[in-house]
Swiss-Prot record:
Subcellular location: Cytoplasm
Lineage of producing organism: Eukaryota, Metazoa, Chordata, Craniata, Vertebrata
The name this protein goes by in its record: Eukaryotic translation initiation factor 1A
Domain of life assignment: Eukaryota
Listed PANTHER family: EIF-1A
Naturally occurring in which organism (per UniProt): Rattus norvegicus
Length: 144
């Protein structure tokens, strides 16, 4: 068998993600663009989004964003509308939570828009289930 003479796999080629710390300029919508919130990921580079103009559209993630920008449900995205198809659109940009909050503050997003917060919601909002102890199970076990 031949010796491995390479310098690593595909993760080495990817390099370090240095864009995370970089603040980018806030991009507002232009003509032919709309803000939307992801409802459902469909796979194959497609998703279903509810636009803030009230229309539900099937969106295609363009090649520049594929495998680089991960989009999840309830993310705020900027989509480019198609002239020839009203019910389909292309994803141009994904806003992170801070950018979405500032868009809401500028009045670009409606007030009812839910932004996917990653903050902790404080005490009492745990996903724990509380059970009440109402049975006399101890007596039944002793009788056996």
């Amino acid at each position: 068998m031949p010796k491995n003479k390479g310098k690593g796999g595909k993760n080495r080629r990817r390099g370090k993600n240095e864009n995370e710390s970089e603040k980018r300029e806030l991009v507002f919508k232009e003509d032919g663009q709309e803000y939307a919130q992801v409802i459902k990921m469909l796979g194959n580079g497609r998703l279903e989004a509810m636009c803030f103009d009230g229309v539900r559209r099937l969106c295609h993630i363009r090649g520049k964003l594929r495998k680089k920008v991960w989009i999840n449900t309830s993310d705020i995205i900027l989509i480019g509308l198609r002239d020839y198809q009203d019910n389909k659109a292309d994803v141009i940009l994904k806003y992170n939570a801070d950018e979405a909050r500032s868009l809401k503050a500028y009045g670009e997003l409606p007030e009812h828009a839910k932004i996917n917060e990653t903050d902790t919601f404080g005490p009492g909002d745990d996903d724990e289930i509380q059970f009440d102890d109402i049975g006399d199970d101890d007596e039944d076990i002793d009788d056996i």
